[in-house]
């Protein structure tokens, strides 16, 4: 899922943190790619014309293998050296999210069956993509393929994004590659997005710089993690009523998630107490007397006391109705963020989620060796052609490209030889009288300055 709304916040408040590149400009870079995200992406995107996943004659799914083989070759052809990182055991806190995803897949299956009966082809395709699930077999087959391609793959103890971030921090790779923005929350210094997208999409590679993002948001790393949790992450139920703008405002106003949670819980308790007090007041109010027709007096007129009582009753009912309307209106507004109606779930262990981001379960970068060698061509033919039904000609051509580009001596990048110095800011413009004389020079002033004489003011 990633972090909801984070990209939009960075575009608005830290635009300098995001750059777009053509893939060709990334030659010479080593990148740790979130393989688990890539498998899911390939199972959804690599399809037949009828929208079904690619399969061989035996009915086995091959979309993930097709995606990994050809997209990796494209990456390598552009001078990039990829290393793939696979998910390990998910954190305990994530199990609730995973169970909800399972429920949604089951719902999509039922809706998909119904769409086959009465829906359109587009409906069937949409629901079938929602039922995609990455299996243990998918992971094992992709790992086998990558080893035959001689592309490094790492099995993370837990979250793949966290391990990618660790490899980038440790200098093993230049950047982490993933579509999940929580890779930044795991402290990846550089994040590449869209790296494994198909060439047909013509989607530029998005590079996000964490340091520039923190500077633009005016936050330290701890506050950034707090912001990401408040926006909505994989480990906690999202807080209804909190959007990107309100989340940023709350963190800036209170300084951290601990203070934000305390503030929101206090406001929720105050609203609850106020509502209970109003309910008690309404319960204590006397019920209006029933309308009973009173007999006329001797003059044929109603008693004046009865008229006064009726008027009081009428006013009381009108006041009660108005109060009820105001209460309903207030309750409706209170559901959003404007009237402090944000409700934090009773069970919301944000401290535990924060520890997962700040101290993730990863293999230290200095204990990981990434090595790119010659591919096992005959092994690839045996696996992809004999076992999975791929075209032998295309597999051998792909293997030739891998051999050529993985072993080619990479051309050095200019930014590896030079240190880019920040541009010196121009001196501040003078204000008030005499400002014009310090601005654009008039004719003759250059000569006056060159001779060391001070130009006379007119």
From Swiss-Prot:
What GO cellular component is one of the record's annotations?
nucleolus
Q: Where is the composition biased (Basic and acidic residues)?
A: 310-329, 442-452
Q: Where does Mg(2+) 2 bind?
A: 180, 182, 234
**CDD domains tied to this protein:** PIN_FEN1
Localization of this protein: Nucleus, Nucleolus; Nucleus, Nucleoplasm; Mitochondrion
Could you say which cofactors this protein requires? Mg(2+)
List where Acidic residues composition bias occurs.
275-285, 293-309
Region feature N-domain, mapped onto this chain: 1-105
Binding positions (Mg(2+) 1): 34, 87, 159, 161
Q: Specify the inducers.
A: Expressed throughout the meiotic cell cycle.
Q: Where does DNA bind?
A: 47, 71, 159, 232, 234
**Origin: domain of life:** Eukaryota
EC number(s) in its UniProt entry? Answer: 3.1.-.-
Residue ranges for the region (Interaction with PCNA) are 410-418
> Which PROSITE patterns does this entry report, sorted A to Z?
XPG_1 (PS00841), XPG_2 (PS00842)
Mind telling me how this protein is modified after translation? Phosphorylated. Phosphorylation upon DNA damage induces relocalization to the nuclear plasma.
> Mind listing the UniProt keywords for this protein, alphabetically?
DNA damage, DNA repair, DNA replication, Endonuclease, Exonuclease, Hydrolase, Magnesium, Metal-binding, Mitochondrion, Nuclease, Nucleus, Phosphoprotein
Which residues does the annotated region (Disordered) include?
Answer: 268-347, 416-458
Q: Which portions of the sequence form the region I-domain?
A: 123-254
Q: Which GO terms describe its molecular function?
A: 5'-3' exonuclease activity; 5'-flap endonuclease activity; DNA binding; magnesium ion binding
Q: What does this protein do?
A: Structure-specific nuclease with 5'-flap endonuclease and 5'-3' exonuclease activities involved in DNA replication and repair. During DNA replication, cleaves the 5'-overhanging flap structure that is generated by displacement synthesis when DNA polymerase encounters the 5'-end of a downstream Okazaki fragment. It enters the flap from the 5'-end and then tracks to cleave the flap base, leaving a nick for ligation. Also involved in the long patch base excision repair (LP-BER) pathway, by cleaving within the apurinic/apyrimidinic (AP) site-terminated flap.
Which named protein is this? Flap endonuclease 1
Organism from which the protein derives: Coprinopsis cinerea
């Amino acid at each position: 899922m990633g972090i909801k709304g984070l990209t939009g916040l960075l575009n608005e408040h830290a635009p300098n943190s995001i750059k777009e590149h053509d893939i060709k400009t990334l030659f010479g870079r080593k990148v740790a790619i979130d393989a688990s995200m890539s498998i899911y992406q390939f199972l959804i995107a690599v399809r037949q014309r009828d929208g079904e996943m690619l399969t061989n004659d035996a009915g086995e799914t091959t979309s993930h293998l097709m995606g990994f083989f050809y997209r990796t070759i494209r990456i390598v052809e552009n001078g990039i050296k990829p290393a793939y990182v696979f998910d390990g055991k998910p954190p305990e806190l994530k199990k609730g999210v995973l169970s909800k995803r399972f429920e949604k897949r089951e719902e999509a299956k039922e809706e998909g069956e119904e769409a086959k009966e009465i829906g359109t082809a587009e409906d069937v395709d949409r629901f079938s993509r929602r039922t995609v699930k990455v299996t243990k077999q998918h992971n094992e087959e992709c790992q086998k393929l990558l080893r035959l391609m001689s592309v490094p793959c790492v099995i993370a103890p837990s979250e793949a994004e966290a391990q990618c971030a660790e490899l980038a921090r440790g200098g093993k790779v230049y950047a982490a590659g993933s579509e999940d923005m929580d890779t930044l929350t795991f402290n990846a210094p550089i994040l590449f997005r869209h790296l494994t997208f198909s060439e047909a999409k013509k989607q530029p590679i998005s590079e996000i710089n964490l340091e520039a993002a923190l500077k633009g948001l005016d936050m330290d790393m701890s506050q950034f993690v707090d912001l990401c949790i408040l926006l909505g992450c994989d480990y906690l139920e999202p807080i209804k009523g909190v959007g990107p703008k309100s989340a940023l405002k709350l963190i800036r106003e209170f300084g951290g998630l601990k203070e934000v949670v305390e503030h929101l819980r206090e406001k929720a308790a105050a609203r609850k107490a106020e509502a209970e007090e109003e309910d008690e007041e309404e319960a204590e109010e006397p019920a209006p007397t029933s309308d009973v027709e009173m007999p006329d007096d001797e003059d044929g007129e109603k008693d004046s006391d009865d008229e006064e009582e009726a008027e009081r009753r009428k006013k009381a009912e009108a006041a009660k109705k108005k109060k009820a309307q105001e209460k309903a209106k207030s309750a409706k507004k209170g559901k959003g963020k404007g009237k402090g109606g944000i409700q934090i779930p009773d069970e919301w262990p944000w401290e535990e989620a924060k520890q997962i981001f700040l101290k993730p379960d990863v293999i230290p970068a200095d204990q990981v060796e990434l090595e790119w060698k010659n591919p096992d061509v005959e092994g690839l033919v045996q696996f992809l052609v004999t076992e999975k039904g791929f075209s032998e000609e295309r597999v051998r051509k792909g293997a030739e490209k891998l051999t050529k580009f993985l072993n080619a001596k990479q051309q050095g990048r200019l930014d590896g030889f030079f240190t880019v110095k920040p541009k010196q800011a121009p001196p501040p413009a003078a204000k008030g009288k005499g400002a014009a004389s310090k601005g654009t020079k008039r004719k003759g002033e250059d000569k006056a300055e060159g001779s060391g004489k001070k130009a006379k003011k007119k």
